[in-house]
């Protein structure tokens, strides 16, 4: 069973994906997401923080992600890009959530929406990103 927070992360990634693909304004995308049946089971506050925070800071986040990529940024799958941007926001702006939780949630969201091995790619990038963004947080064992 998915938690409200997982649903919020999935919906935020879907919203970021829509913004990358359709170039629709964020308020319109959020309105459309809120009309989805799954939204009633989501944490609305978390969705808002993730989606609007990612939208506001996406240019900064891609600057943090770009040097960690093993391919050209243009070759990134849009789902992987949306997951990485959303997780980068959560790592940067939500210190109350431990980074292993953020990475695990991003992996699970990528497994749901991404390609066959996309979750492995996302895991590798986010491990490096977490070390940069949260260098003082205790490491996983």
Curated annotation (Swiss-Prot):
GO terms for molecular function: RNA binding. SUPFAM superfamilies: NusB-like. Keywords: RNA-binding, Transcription, Transcription antitermination, Transcription regulation. InterPro entries: NusB-like_sf, NusB_fam, NusB_RsmB_TIM44. NCBIfam families: nusB. Belongs to the NusB family. This is Transcription antitermination protein NusB. The lineage of its organism: Bacteria, Pseudomonadati, Pseudomonadota, Betaproteobacteria, Neisseriales. The gene is nusB.
